[in-house]
Amino acid sequence: MTASPKNEMWTVFKRLMGYLKPMKGMFLLSVVGLIVYGLVDAAFISFIGPFIDKGFSSSAPAISNGIALPTSQGFHADNQVLLMAPIVVILMFSLRGFANFVSTYGISYMSARLIMDMRQQVFEHYLSLPVSYMDKENTGNLISKVTFDTEQIARASGSALISIVRDSVTIIGMLGLMFYNSWKLSLCILVIGPIMGVVITIVSRRFRKVSKQIQTAMGDVSAATEQMIKGHKNVLAFGGQETETARFAKINDRNRHQNMKLAVAQAVSQPLIMVIGSFALAFVLYAASLDSMKADLTAGTFATILGAMMAMLQPIKNLTRVNAEFQRGIAACTTVFELLDTVPESDTGTYTVARAKGNLRFDNVSFSYEGQERRALEKIDFEVSQGQTLALVGRSGSGKSTIASLVTRFYTGLESGDILLDDVSIYDYSLKSLRSQVALVSQQVTLFNDTIANNIAYAYPGEVTREQIIEAATLAHAMEFIEQLPDGLDTQVGENGVLLSGGQRQRIAIARAMLRDAPVLILDEATSALDTESEKAIQQGLDNLRQNRTSVVIAHRLSTIESADQILVVDQGRIVERGTHKSLLELGGMYAKLYQMQFGS
């Protein structure tokens, strides 16, 4: 049974309030400031009645030196009340200003802290999610949750706290003031209350629905922008400016349309609340004109009630306006909490080892990706011992990279079989321990917007010296181009290494793997971006790296794996051939055909 929208909203709100627990002192201080602010407003209105009734009275003429002074209005002034009035006003508004400062500072502090904490939690949760989740999610939506959604939540939280506390206290104070002065007249306004409640409930549902659509639309805008920026060169090369412009215009207009839906709902709700409030005010004015009411009213009392009613209109309007903001925040909260509730990567293994020997075995492994009926791997069975090199070759999409991804548990859920490292199932290892045994160089190199040295030393377990970085870069034949750069190892590579060539990026990635010095090495098309000269130069370094390490090499260029101890030919998820380079050529099967296609007869 699904929760009602109202119950769901309060569940989300209570969960959001949990983020304020570490700041409960600041929260209480802000609430006190807001309460004082609202009470001062009510106190100021309550001052109107005595000021009129006692400050100005028609009960007796004004007296000066024992002589009655006629006035055109028939009132005389109580000088003591009139003299006290300015002092009271100054004190009230000074207190109100101080309370406003305290509450504003406190809410700003909590909002900034809330944004920081939620962003940190979302970012850390991204790092704990499986690769399969990232494969199917829209990158723009993921980024939007960190940037846009968290801002919406903080803004809504601050606005909601201000209105819910300050404006509610003001309204309650004004109602109390009205009932204290004339409960009969004040009952008139309660007739309108339920009608306002129904209107606000209906509008709230509309706000929440449209706000969720806005979150999605903003994610689409982020995704389209990111896609264009990443593919900027291709867009220019293929003359796709008009295509991208039209695509973004469509997405952008959809976002505008969703925002206009919210604006219309907000524009309709506020005047509607005001019109309903005007009926209440008109009803009070009518009731005050009745003879039965006049007997109990003084000029000051009526002015107080009227002033209280007028003073309530703006807080009611604020509550209606903040309702739209609040619903946007709840919608953003819902999407963020759905993300945070996503099950992180499974890490139930407890086995740890400082350094594995590197004996790797696939035991009759079958695997299919989530949502795919066809198996990506079918009964894969092989063993590679410490210090040996296993090469995987085959057509694109045959399953080579899937085998490599399973070793690091990027994907889980084998349909049959097991994968063992040193005769221990990789699923018995803790993720941290397992992945510390593996160094990976893929065909899609990821470099961070930092120096070359820091990219080579990325995530190195422990302190790393400059000499170690230089040694790794030298073995990867990266120092050849690094020494020619103005800042050498301290050269900034730009976002994802955009300031370097493809071959240079690949060699930095290889140097990173060399520095890691893991017992298992996975090279997924590691030399694909290198020219022939660079490829030959780096082979000696790779041969040195492979010594006493288990190496799994996925290669398109067959010249790079001729020295492999074992070569597996993979086709449609199955191993169709296995052997050494020489034996497979003699076999005259698929490997021989692939070799012939690259090098001729």
UniProtKB/Swiss-Prot annotation:
Catalytically driven reaction(s): ATP + H2O + lipid A-core oligosaccharideSide 1 = ADP + phosphate + lipid A-core oligosaccharideSide 2
EC number: 7.5.2.6
Enzyme class: translocase
Bilayer-spanning residue ranges: 32-52, 81-101, 160-180, 183-203, 267-287, 296-316
PROSITE patterns from the UniProt entry: ABC_TM1F, ABC_TRANSPORTER_1, ABC_TRANSPORTER_2, MSBA
Ranges for domain ABC transmembrane type-1: 28-328
One Pfam family here: ABC_membrane
InterPro entries the UniProt entry points to: AAA+_ATPase, ABC1_TM_dom, ABC1_TM_sf, ABC_transporter-like_ATP-bd, ABC_transporter-like_CS, ABC_transpr_lipidA, P-loop_NTPase, Type_1_exporter
Domain spans labelled ABC transporter: 360-597
Topology of the protein relative to the lipid bilayer: Multi-pass membrane protein
CDD domains in the record: ABC_6TM_MsbA_like
Compartment(s) where it occurs, according to its Swiss-Prot or TrEMBL record: Cell inner membrane
GO annotation, cellular component aspect: plasma membrane
Positions that bind ATP: 394-401
Family of this protein: Belongs to the ABC transporter superfamily. Lipid exporter (TC 3.A.1.106) family.
Subunit structure: Homodimer.
Function as written in the Swiss-Prot or TrEMBL entry: Involved in lipopolysaccharide (LPS) biosynthesis. Translocates lipid A-core from the inner to the outer leaflet of the inner membrane. Transmembrane domains (TMD) form a pore in the inner membrane and the ATP-binding domain (NBD) is responsible for energy generation.
Protein name: ATP-dependent lipid A-core flippase
The organism's taxonomic lineage, starting at the top: Bacteria, Pseudomonadati, Pseudomonadota, Gammaproteobacteria, Alteromonadales
